Amino acid sequence: MKRIAVLTSGGDAPGMNAAIRAVVRKAISEGIEVYGINHGYAGMVAGDIFPLTSASVGDKIGRGGTFLYSARYPEFAQVEGQLAGIEQLKKFGIEGVVVIGGDGSYHGAMRLTEHGFPAVGLPGTIDNDIVGTDFTIGFDTAVSTVVDALDKIRDTSSSHNRTFVVEVMGRNAGDIALNAGIAAGADDISIPELEFKFENVVNNINKGYEKGKNHHIIIVAEGVMTGEEFATKLKEAGYKGDLRVSVLGHIQRGGSPTARDRVLASRMGARAVELLRDGIGGVAVGIRNEELVESPILGTAEEGALFSLTTEGGIKVNNPHKAGLELYRLNSALNNLNLN
């Protein structure tokens, strides 16, 4: 393989630029030319494709976002869009593609491979909801951003004897909420993977007041409901105290990537080039127990929920390589809470 391309697709994540940099420089070291595709699959179909050099990725490793830009392009789910994209790639002499993004991006990469065009996926999403990897590019930075915000919210919460409901991102996964909540010492964490009762949340807050605690931080993952809806439900369940809502929003996607995300992205980017060099496509690179692994890309595009309740009321672990259930129980133990 003499020429490959790299694109970013879907929601941006800190560390994407570090991954692009690794792809470019590893490929050059292997004697492979690299082209960048602007705006994801939309740019592929439009032919917005250009050569990248080592200088093109200079000083990019610490930048948030993606300098190749990103976009959602549902038209690529159709065969016509896929074939149009492949036609453009062939015009530029490109023989393989590295796709950095989430599960929607992975589906596009799989379609390319099915049409005989090798594609390798890298998990770029703050949600950490990709099966086949312990961590995704951008997750660590997002958690750090949320923890920093929670520390600041705690300052004002304690000054006014208030309870704050803080809504965080994660789509249908509770990874950000769990990890940031543990790190920031949140009093309660609500995630979409497990059911809970608002009455129990109110009781736990009241128990805190009885023990002399004058403020509380409640984390709610966006996959549960909005922060405003959650606050309303708390009031309906009997909460009488001063209650405020903070929605952290898109600051969770921005910012300079942490050292961990930079290293992870660099390792994954280099591995993607090695796979394409060897003619391997249709796989996604992940990390498990600190070792790089590859998985069939179609399987990794499934929902990455950590765990869920069974019909009998037990807990089913959907991805044993993630520590979600352990963290949920840890938070309950640290705050003397009931599991539900």
UniProtKB/Swiss-Prot annotation:
Optimum pH is 7.2-7.8. It comes from the Bacteria. It catalyses: beta-D-fructose 6-phosphate + ATP = beta-D-fructose 1,6-bisphosphate + ADP + H(+). PROSITE patterns: PHOSPHOFRUCTOKINASE. Pfam families: PFK. One of its GO terms (molecular function) is ATP binding. Catalyzes the phosphorylation of D-fructose 6-phosphate to fructose 1,6-bisphosphate by ATP, the first committing step of glycolysis. This is ATP-dependent 6-phosphofructokinase. It comes from Lactococcus lactis subsp. lactis. The lineage of its organism: Bacteria, Bacillati, Bacillota, Bacilli, Lactobacillales. The gene is pfkA.
